[in-house]
């Protein structure tokens, strides 16, 4: 019973971390990375499909991504989708290959992205704390119903607190890493 609550909390906290990781991957740093474009939806025969499912995305050099569609007729729709994504990117097509050069970030844009990173990290921290609160409430319910003792409740709360601290430390680490990447010129 107690282990179920702890395991459930752990899996939910890990999902929050995964969500943060996904959100941070969408933010553009100075370096080219395929995750910048993977979430872009392309019109593939009238179905919105992620770019990663209709083309291969590769790093050509630190500031350029190259996209190779698996079908010739997808070059145009992919180019349009990248422009519509409003990432400030201008794709250039050479035959079947679409090259996407990444312009350097301005200081103002870097600061704005760093603020977004801090906001996303705070959302993740709040989600993790909410999970902790729910787990602690579940433990209190079990204690009120006399299914567990006070000592067991305290031990479980301590375990959940350690788990929470570890997850929040991971959030802080991910956020500071992303901020450092953003501020690197």
From Swiss-Prot:
Major subcellular site: cytoplasm
SUPFAM superfamilies in UniProt: Ribosome recycling factor, RRF (SSF55194)
UniProt entry tagged with the keyword Protein biosynthesis: yes
Keyword Transmembrane attached: no
InterPro entries per the UniProt record, alphabetical: Ribosome_recyc_fac (IPR002661), Ribosome_recyc_fac_dom (IPR023584), RRF_sf (IPR036191)
Compartment annotation: Cytoplasm
Family: Belongs to the RRF family.
Protein name: Ribosome-recycling factor
Source lineage: Bacteria, Pseudomonadati, Pseudomonadota, Gammaproteobacteria, Legionellales
